[in-house]
Amino acid sequence: MVASNLTLQQRGWFDVLDDWLKRDRFVFVGWSGLLLFPTAYLAIGGWLTGTTFVTSWYTHGLASSYLEGANFLTAAVSTPADAMGHSLLLLWGPEAQGDFIRWCQLGGLWAFVALHGAFALIGFMLRQFELARLIGIRPYNAIAFSGPIAVFVSVFLIYPLGQSSWFFAPSFGVAAIFRFLLFLQGFHNWTLNPFHMMGVAGILGGALLSAIHGVTVENTLYQDGEQANTFKAFDSTQEEETYSMVTANRFWSQIFGIAFSNKRWLHFFMLFVPVMGLWTSSIGIIGLALNLRAYDFVSQEIRASEDPEFETFYTKNILLNEGLRAWLAPVDQPHENFVFPEEVLPRGNAL
């Protein structure tokens, strides 16, 4: 008894805190939780505050809050004014000077949500690393989650850092994200970018693989019985697999002429496809931050300009992009006071 008390007394505060953080509880905390929970709480709270009360009139000339009449699809926490450049927009910084209302008007909430959101995602990834380490499994969950982190950081942070200001990042809202997608298409021809193509293939391919895998397992479940390994429930200690890999292999071999014969390769492939899609999309967005162009089929553009009867889907899309730029820019960037003469504006076929 005395020895145990001495042991407890000799333990430092770090060991005591370590034990408390890693204690088995309903919601695991861990060291990663010290980063995750405060930053996630502040990011979500900042977003809810902004979408409820804060206008975008001073930054975008828009109404963007429930208080102004926006709904869930049109409300947003908008990016800071273009004049703010890449300032961190700290509440106590030279722009707001501690004035909370002025800070909100300048777009400080966006910087607040973006910064804390990025750290929250990193905290969630570290949480998966930490828990995997504690229970003795491999860290592929955390590695896979690097995909969403890469997309968030590239889209919300790296892209605007490559442009003139935070203004050109996406605002945090549904319709605001759609505006950003149209902007990427009109100004960067994003859909023709090979990294976007790889991203689409990865995400849709991952969804397809997930659906195929799910139905295959469902289709090859053992018939329920009363035996130890096939009773009407799942037992974490059962000796055999719950579904028949052999039957699944035979089925897909007949359908496609080829099938996975190894579970590890199958599941790694299901991990690899969507994560690579996210990574390649992120690389593409970094390219856009540097204003790198996608494919330019100049020969088709030259021929289309010389021959009125020659047009391809590519040349049609280029014209659509010109229309997007001409009509989007004056509305999207009202502070620039763009005025385009009528003769250079695109006209629809009906006109």
UniProtKB/Swiss-Prot annotation:
PSII is composed of 1 copy each of membrane proteins PsbA, PsbB, PsbC, PsbD, PsbE, PsbF, PsbH, PsbI, PsbJ, PsbK, PsbL, PsbM, PsbT, PsbX, PsbY, PsbZ, Psb30/Ycf12, peripheral proteins PsbO, CyanoQ (PsbQ), PsbU, PsbV and a large number of cofactors. It forms dimeric complexes. A plastoquinone binds at H213, F260. This is Photosystem II D2 protein. It is found in: Host cellular thylakoid membrane. It comes from Synechococcus phage S-RSM2. The chain crosses the membrane at residues 39-59, 123-139, 151-164, 206-226, 277-293. Keywords: Chlorophyll, Chromophore, Electron transport, Host membrane, Host thylakoid, Iron, Magnesium, Membrane, Metal-binding, Oxidoreductase, Photosynthesis, Photosystem II, Transmembrane, Transmembrane helix, Transport. Chlorophyll a PD2 binds at H196. Pheophytin a binds at Q128, N141. It is an enzyme of class 1 (oxidoreductase). PANTHER family: PHOTOSYSTEM II D2 PROTEIN, PHOTOSYSTEM II PROTEIN D1. InterPro entries: D1/D2 (IPR055266), Photo_II_D1/D2_sf (IPR036854), Photo_RC_L/M (IPR000484), PSII_PsbD/D2 (IPR005868). It catalyses: 2 a plastoquinone + 4 hnu + 2 H2O = 2 a plastoquinol + O2. One of its GO terms (cellular component) is host thylakoid membrane. Its main location: host cell. Fe cation binds at H213, H267. Its EC number is 1.10.3.9. It is a multi-pass membrane protein. Chlorophyll a ChlzD2 binds at H116. The keyword Transcription regulation does not apply.
